[in-house]
């Protein structure tokens, strides 16, 4: 709700975490030629610092358009880092994290006590894919993991399964508290 209050650079960096579940290090090292359109699909090429490898993943059209405007507005060349440090190199994760925490505090996100954990968005995206019945292998490839075991650790499936089981239980005839109260009222008459 308050993202529009953040500096433009932080907004764009955050959108890559939130929309795509990229690692913060991947966002910090994006270059001007990272975005492209192929037919009707939009893509990003990301250098995975941790894996020392490139990956290509689909992105929402809206993010593609936002970033094309950002690149043009800031005259970022294809081989330049998009989010630069003061010397023109890649933005450091520590700087990004500090700036995000400060922006969250200034804008009273969670009463100024929000703890920015960039990696949590990777878990959220993985869980969203899993809940949408995307195969574990596809999620692994999307996240850039080598092994499925690592991907399994990213899927926060237990809370959703517990919530679903809870909902199913209370939807059963006679299981809701309201039905018990009504039953007691009838028995008391």
Regions found by a protein language model. Give the residues of each.
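Basic, Lys/Arg- and aromatic-enriched nucleic-acid-binding interface segment
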Residues: 1-24, 41, 122
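Short, basic (Lys/Arg/His-rich) helix/loop patches that form interaction surfaces
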Residues: 10, 20, 97-137
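Alpha-helix N-cap/helix-start motif at helix boundaries, enriched for small hydrophobics
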Residues: 13, 25-30, 139
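Short alpha-helical segment immediately N-terminal to, or the first helix within
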Residues: 16-17, 128-129, 142
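Conserved tyrosine-mediated DNA breakage-rejoining catalytic core shared by Y-recombinases
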Residues: 20, 29-68, 149, 189
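Catalytic-site neighborhood detector that most strongly recognizes the C-terminal catalytic loop/helix
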Residues: 48-52, 143-171
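Active-site/catalytic core of tyrosine-dependent DNA strand-transfer enzymes
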Residues: 60-113
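C-terminal secondary-structure termini that scaffold catalytic or DNA-interacting sites
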Residues: 87, 167-189
């Amino acid at each position: 709700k308050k993202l529009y209050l953040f500096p433009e650079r932080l907004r764009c960096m955050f959108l890559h975490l939130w929309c795509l579940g990229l690692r913060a290090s991947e966002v910090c090292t994006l270059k001007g030629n990272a975005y492209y359109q192929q037919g009707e699909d939009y893509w990003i090429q990301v250098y995975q610092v941790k894996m020392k490898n490139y990956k290509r993943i689909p992105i929402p059209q809206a993010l593609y358009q936002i970033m094309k405007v950002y690149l043009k507005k800031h005259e970022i060349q294809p081989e330049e880092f998009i989010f630069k440090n003061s010397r023109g190199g890649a933005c450091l994760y520590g700087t990004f994290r500090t700036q995000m925490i400060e922006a969250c505090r200034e804008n009273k996100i969670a009463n100024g006590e929000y703890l920015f954990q960039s990696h949590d968005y990777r878990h959220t995206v993985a869980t969203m894919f899993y809940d949408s019945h995307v195969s574990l292998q596809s999620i692994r490839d999307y996240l850039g993991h080598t092994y499925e075991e690592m991907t399994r650790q990213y899927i926060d499936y237990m809370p959703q399964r517990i919530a679903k089981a809870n909902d199913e239980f209370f939807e059963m005839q006679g299981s809701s508290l309201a039905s018990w109260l009504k039953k007691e009222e009838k028995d008391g008459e």
